[in-house]
Design a protein with these regions (language model features):
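A short beta-loop-alpha structural element at the N-terminal edge
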Residues: 14-28, 35-39, 173-188
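Conserved acetyl-CoA-binding loop-helix of GNAT-fold acetyltransferases
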Residues: 102-105, 111-124, 142-147, 241-253
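Amide-forming acyltransferase catalytic core, primarily the GNAT-like/NAT-type
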Residues: 128, 147-231, 246
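Active-site rim helix/loop that mediates acceptor-substrate recognition in acyltransferases
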Residues: 30-76, 80-82, 193-213
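Conserved beta-strand in the GNAT
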Residues: 76-78, 83-92, 99-104, 215, ...
């Protein structure tokens, strides 16, 4: 536990490390913060926080991810007021790259300095490793990141539609269902190193237990991988020209699994994937 702080509420706040036992509490902070953000952005779609049944379904779907992040985090900090968790932040390190996975503060406590305090704990100023994050467009949060030298590189949009069973797209790719084997993880990690310049084997071991993984080969050599499930992705391909064939296959697999929704987050710099998705009736969420 570390020193306490006092917000504009004149209520004492203490900061303490988090653990897997705090997963549900931080899930609720995220859901309430996200609902507030969507309201401020003018989005009218209902969020799960107002519907106990929907909230329970969302927690059931995401609990494994929260537990995985808690188990593999490098820094995980909570802001507490009494027994209530009012904010949290977490970062992971993968092969020398630090990723800020979450930074969320309850609406009533935003702009009180809690975000800055939490960020300082999970992104140490003296650290020299490479850093990145996937951030919302919330301007106060953006200001925090910019002050720490984290600058936007590109936007990421969520594309989705009801999946269709599609004819196989003409391609010389061979598609193989991946098993949770050391060999498959090694292949995926090698491709991560080649394209992303770091490995994330611990995440592949979790992903392949949650979703159906696929390896893509050309002339006997691995050229990519992807995951399809209740949540799909990530997809990594050494040649972006393969995205139409891979996404056609992935959508068909989602339909074959009986899913009513197929969606994935796509960096808009991936023009081949974006063009394919838009030309095939996918919708965009902010």
């Amino acid at each position: 536990m570390t020193r306490s702080s006092t917000s504009a509420h004149e209520s004492p706040i203490r900061f303490q490390p988090g653990s897997a036992a705090d997963s549900y509490a931080v899930f609720l902070v995220f859901e309430r913060s996200y609902a507030d953000l969507t309201r401020r952005l003018g989005m009218t779609e209902p969020t799960s926080v107002a519907d106990p049944a929907a909230l329970a379904r969302t927690w059931a779907a995401r609990r494994s991810m929260y537990d995985h992040l808690a188990a593999t985090a490098d820094h995980f900090w909570l802001a507490k007021r009494g027994d209530e968790t009012v904010g949290f932040a977490r970062s992971i390190v993968r092969d020398g790259v630090r990723l800020l996975t979450e930074l969320f503060v309850l609406p009533g406590w935003q702009s009180s300095g809690l975000g800055r305090e939490l960020l300082a704990r999970v992104l140490p100023a003296q650290a020299t490793e490479r850093r990145w994050l996937l951030a919302t467009t919330d301007l106060p949060a953006q200001a925090l990141y910019l002050k720490r030298g984290l600058y936007p590189r590109f936007s990421v949009y969520y594309f989705w539609r009801q999946p269709r069973q599609l004819p196989t797209r003409e391609s010389d790719l061979a598609i193989e269902a991946a098993t949770p084997s050391a060999a498959a993880i090694q292949i995926m990690g090698d491709m991560d190193t080649r394209l992303l310049d770091h490995r994330r084997d611990v995440d592949h071991r979790w992903l392949i237990g949650q979703r159906q993984g696929y390896l893509y080969h050309r002339a006997g050599r691995p050229v990519g991988y992807g995951y399809v499930g209740q949540t799909s992705g990530p997809f990594l391909l050494l040649d972006e020209a393969d995205f139409p064939a891979v996404l056609t296959h992935a959508e068909g697999e989602a339909a074959r699994q009986g899913r009513s929704h197929f969606g994935l987050e796509v960096p808009v710099v991936n023009h081949r994937a974006v063009n394919y998705l838009l030309s095939n009736g996918f919708c965009i969420d902010r």
